[in-house]
């Protein structure tokens, strides 16, 4: 063994984080940008002491909620295309438990983040300590075991020397494009402060090379043959295409060979919305244009996609009698889906090499791509100009609320603003290079269908876990990634109530974020779901005990935190608020009261959800029968 240096486990951890670098396409930079922390008795005297003594280049931010700060860390990594991360340090017990939802969010989205929850005593001398759970069947079980199912890598450190192999394994996982996800290292609180003679070589600069995985000649030949044999291929652009940086290759392939592009939520803004062959999002929350193309396709080229139920309309979006699949993915598991021909390789490299193998090919779509795009643009224009009337108004979500109920909402909330009109007003008003973020409720559907991003990587949707509360927290992560851009959280009142603690963190550190709050006084998306399937409007509206609609003054709440706030219930007020918000140096919140049922509906799509097989309600019985009928046309696996 060579020279050693005596450090506590926590001090060794911080030194190691400072020496991790990533190398992609000839560019080398530090991989760990900083650390979010909320100190408690499990980490303040270990990691807290180490950071105070020497944080190195790490930026340290004090979070306000463990889930919130972990979401901020995840959003930063996602926006940086998984090439930089923040670590997250929490105390033992409830602080660690609060990481669970955020870890699941990162895992579902394949986003690297380093989670460092403190753990109970390795010696067990003071057991049970404050915030420790006890199980009769095992003294080894702690709250942190709950993080195992939602971590790509999980370990518990009960000896200082264990840290070395554990960290190397964690960084191997986080820097692997095929496996990237949350790495959780639980460090016993007594071990954090325990000293050990660490080998100095452990702290040498360590470069993690992300070399682009090359396709084999067999894979390229097979892929090219399948494209040439098809007449109507469609490229499904997933998040992997964005992380690979495959924009130019996608455009070239699409333009040259007449292949339309359709997008997943994660893949949106890989290619600009105004690109002629980009038909927008597909599936349950997709455009009619994209869904028409998918329905006619005889080959689906999935580029970096997981084929979630929302992208495939629960496996009903395609004509499976004729459609074949070609999957390009760095993950072998993902490439195997839907009985596809698999190319397990980097998207950018593979698409670039395929381009030269398709000479003379042209799809049979002809003018259909332009026709579908024009048709959808006309529908988008209509949705941007919806106006409410107090008599005979037909909302986008039909046959749920009567005119009287809609009028009741208009009176209670003091608004006549439809959601789609508000959304497209925002799209037309904010700077084109702004980055927008959303996650849950009806807004992701509206955004995937309607939002035009004409600057790459400016559309940030967390729709793998669709975690309520990600929207505001994640906006802080966006601002850390893009300090010179305007960043906007598009969030419903339900998600805002679920979690918005990191708005205070943004204000504390003068990281300007803009919160655009759509308040329809309820869980509107799920209300649509229940009523679409035969149930009544049951506990999804925000109503008082005497059935009055809640009207919360969210602008006043944010004003109390120190944000610049606005109330905008008309298009004119919204435009004025957006323009003024651009001039502010402090975080802003624009509260919009919007009418329920004025979000977009589905376009030639279907979602398989559980419906009661037995019910006293005829409407539920009909919904169940309709579901069973639709399933007959769905692929079984």
From Swiss-Prot:
One of its GO terms (molecular function) is 3D-(3,5/4)-trihydroxycyclohexane-1,2-dione hydrolase activity. Its EC number is 3.7.1.22. Its cofactor is Mg(2+); thiamine diphosphate. SUPFAM superfamilies: DHS-like NAD/FAD-binding domain, Thiamin diphosphate-binding fold (THDP-binding). It catalyses: 3D-3,5/4-trihydroxycyclohexane-1,2-dione + H2O = 5-deoxy-D-glucuronate + H(+). Disulfide bonds: none annotated. Pathway: Polyol metabolism; myo-inositol degradation into acetyl-CoA; acetyl-CoA from myo-inositol: step 3/7. One of its GO terms (cellular component) is acetolactate synthase complex. Residues 442-522 are annotated as: Thiamine pyrophosphate binding. Binds 1 Mg(2+) ion per subunit. Mg(2+) binds at residues 493, 520. Thiamine diphosphate binds at residue 66. Pfam families: TPP_enzyme_C, TPP_enzyme_M, TPP_enzyme_N. The keyword Phosphoprotein does not apply. GO terms for biological process: inositol catabolic process; isoleucine biosynthetic process; L-valine biosynthetic process. Keywords: Hydrolase, Magnesium, Metal-binding, NAD, Thiamine pyrophosphate. Belongs to the TPP enzyme family. Involved in the cleavage of the C1-C2 bond of 3D-(3,5/4)-trihydroxycyclohexane-1,2-dione (THcHDO) to yield 5-deoxy-glucuronate (5DG). This is 3D-(3,5/4)-trihydroxycyclohexane-1,2-dione hydrolase. It comes from Bacillus velezensis (strain DSM 23117 / BGSC 10A6 / LMG 26770 / FZB42).
């Amino acid at each position: 063994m060579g020279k050693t240096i005596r450090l506590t486990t926590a001090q060794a951890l911080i030194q190691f984080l400072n020496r991790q670098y990533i190398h992609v396409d000839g560019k080398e930079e530090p991989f760990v940008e900083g650390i979010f922390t909320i100190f408690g008795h499990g980490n303040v005297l270990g990691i807290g002491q180490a950071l105070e003594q020497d944080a190195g280049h790490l930026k340290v931010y004090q979070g306000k909620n463990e889930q919130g700060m972990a979401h901020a860390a995840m959003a930063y990594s996602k926006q940086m295309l998984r090439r930089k991360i923040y670590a997250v340090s929490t105390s033992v017990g409830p602080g660690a438990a609060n990481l669970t939802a955020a870890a699941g969010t990162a895992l579902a989205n394949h986003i690297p983040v380093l989670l460092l929850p403190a753990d109970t005593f390795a010696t067990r001398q003071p057991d049970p300590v404050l915030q420790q759970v006890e199980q009769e069947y095992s003294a080894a079980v702690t709250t942190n075991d709950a993080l195992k199912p939602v971590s790509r890598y999980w370990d518990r450190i009960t000896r200082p020397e264990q840290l070395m192999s554990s960290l190397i394994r964690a960084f191997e996982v986080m820097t692997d494009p095929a496996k990237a996800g949350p790495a959780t290292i639980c460090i016993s609180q007594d071990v954090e402060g325990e000293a050990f003679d660490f080998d100095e070589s452990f702290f040498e600069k360590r470069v993690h090379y992300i070399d682009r995985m090359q396709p084999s000649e067999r894979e390229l030949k097979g892929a090219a043959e399948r494209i040439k044999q098809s007449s109507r291929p469609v490229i499904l652009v997933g998040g992997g295409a964005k992380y690979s940086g495959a924009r130019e290759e996608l455009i070239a392939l699409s333009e040259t060979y007449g292949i339309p592009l359709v997008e997943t939520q994660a893949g949106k803004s890989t290619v600009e919305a105004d690109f002629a062959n980009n038909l927008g999002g597909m599936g349950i929350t997709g455009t009619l244009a994209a869904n028409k193309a998918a329905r006619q396709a005889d080959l689906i080229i999935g580029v970096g996609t997981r084929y979630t139920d929302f992208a495939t309309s629960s496996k009903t979006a395609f004509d499976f009698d004729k459609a074949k699949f070609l999957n390009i993915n760095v993950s072998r598991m993902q490439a195997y889906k839907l009985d596809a021909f698999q190319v397990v390789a980097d998207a950018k490299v593979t698409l670039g090499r395929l381009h030269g193998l398709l000479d003379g090919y042209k799809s049979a779509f002809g003018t259909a791509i332009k026709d579908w795009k024009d048709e959808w643009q006309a529908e988008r224009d209509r949705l941007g100009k919806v106006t409410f009337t107090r008599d005979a108004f037909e909302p986008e979500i039909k046959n749920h609320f009567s005119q009287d109920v809609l009028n009741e909402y208009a009176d209670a909330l003091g608004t006549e603003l439809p959601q789609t009109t508000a959304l497209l007003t925002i799209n037309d008003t904010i700077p084109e290079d702004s980055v927008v973020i959303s996650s849950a409720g009806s807004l992701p559907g509206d955004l995937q269908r309607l939002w035009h991003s004409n600057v790459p990587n400016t559309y940030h949707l967390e729709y793998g876990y669709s975690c309520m509360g990600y929207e505001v927290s994640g906006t802080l992560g966006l601002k850390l990634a893009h300090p010179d851009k305007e960043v906007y959280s598009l969030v419903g009142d339900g998600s805002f109530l679920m979690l918005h603690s990191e708005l205070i963190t943004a204000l504390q550190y003068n990281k300007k974020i803009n919160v655009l709050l759509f308040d329809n006084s309820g869980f509107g998306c799920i209300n649509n779901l229940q009523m679409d399937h035969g149930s009544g409007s049951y506990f999804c509206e925000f109503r008082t005990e005497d059935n009055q609609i809640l009207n919360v003054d969210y602008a006043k709440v944010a004003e109390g935190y120190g944000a610049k706030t606005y109330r905008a219930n008309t298009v004119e007020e919204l435009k004025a608020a957006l323009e003024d918000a651009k001039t502010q140096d402090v975080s802003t919140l624009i509260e919009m009261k919007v009418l329920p049922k004025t979000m977009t509906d589905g376009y030639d799509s279907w979602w398989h959800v559980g419906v009661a097989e037995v019910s006293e309600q005829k409407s539920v019985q009909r919904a169940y029968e309709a579901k069973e009928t639709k399933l007959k046309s769905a692929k079984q696996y």
